[in-house]
Amino acid sequence: MKRHKICKIIFAILAVFLCVAFYELIGICITYKKHPAVSDATIKETQNIMSVAGRENTERAVIIEKNSQALLERVRLIQNAKDEIILSTFAFKSDESGKLILGALHDAADRGVHVRILVDGMESWIDMEGNPYFYGLSSHENVEIKLYNKANPLKPWKTMGRMHDKYLIADGKIYILGGRNTYNYFLGDFPGHKNFDRDVLVVCDEPQKDNSVNQLWNYFETIWEQEDCRYFHNSKKLADRQSVKKAVLELQEGYQQYFEVNKEKICDTDYADETFETEKIILLSNPIHTQAKEPVVWYQLGELMKNAKERVKIHTPYIICNDMMYNTWEEIAQKVPDFSIMTNSVANNGNPFGAADYAKNRNRILETGIDIWEYEGGYSYHGKSILIDDDLSVIGSFNMDMRSTYLDTELMLVIRSKEINKQLEDGMMEYESVSRQVLDDGTYYDPYHVKPIELTEKRKRKVFLVQHLLGWARDLF
């Protein structure tokens, strides 16, 4: 009798779990499996964007390639801010680099700087809830933290709409934008796993109405005020907790140590010798609602690439495309003589979903006419950039996959500048020198004599399972 009762309880728990899973699955599929088309308004807007791409510009820029430099430049912006700091990030952890950023932000707030932070509501649920380091910042009188689309299992129709933006603005005059999240994988040179990515720093001493810094600031204000963004634990009473006091003290001491070691560089506010002139900088963005999105950024990037005269070079960590996306690449390949893409090899890809889909669809990608280079550097490459001819560069958060195309908020910065283009080309080539070109027959062209990463049996099994169990959801990962 007792055993029978236990079986009934287990069965009831399992039934509830399956019902919840079915509810979540139905809500997600109904909302996100249908992909919106490009609107006439986007087509018209894209034509206008291209027509003003060469107008006079007062902004200067430089690309940030190394993770150690990326951390230092963020601290530098925060330390020298006088009035306002805006930080938007997909993921924010309280590891070594995350604590340094938290410490720098807390120090700025102590100086009277108004700090606003926006974090994706799924990642924050994992990394920030119950965390005294984040409570120490959110309870500060000069700090506001909001979460975009906070995770809610009762609303599966909003689950997949994530905020993937990554940028930092100081005083409405200088910003960093790119693909780096706010933790050790991307910032600093700490032991352990790393992801290689890329940012661009933009400076404008006297911003004008249509400068990119104002485009980005206006974008932030719009998303900050929308109803899907809710405050994160802003009670001032949190500061009285012993765990929070201890965390704040640790942040202050850790930041002061980092500041003293790097003081000369951090306090340098003259960017003139470090940056390059630009003719025009344009911000491309996806819709900011949480439903399935019109593929605005994908379309605009495609049109920019179709207008290339000689070359287009794409770097992306993942390639997960549908027919519309493949068709775009086919059109580019027909128009542009030199069209290539570099992505992680199956063995080198840190994302099992990206690795599995690429392994299955590599031949379909080759059929578009694009040349594929596989990165074999040992650490997963996370850079999201496009090089067009000798004067146009595109850097940001957009992956060449269906999630970036239809589900996430995304930002890409388009920069017209021969100097930035050359800097981007040099940065790309550093990674391409550890890559091999995939040939149509499945063999490789290996001009750099690269030793490929071993595809282990464990990775093979993982790829197989993802392909066969989750392939139906390839547009959701």
Summary of predicted features, one role per range:
Residues 2-143, 153-164, 170-477:
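Charged, low-complexity intrinsically disordered terminal segments
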Residues 146:
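Phosphate-binding P-loop/Walker A region and its immediate neighborhood
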Residues 150:
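Short loop/turn segments at beta-alpha junctions that line or gate ligand-sensing/allosteric surfaces
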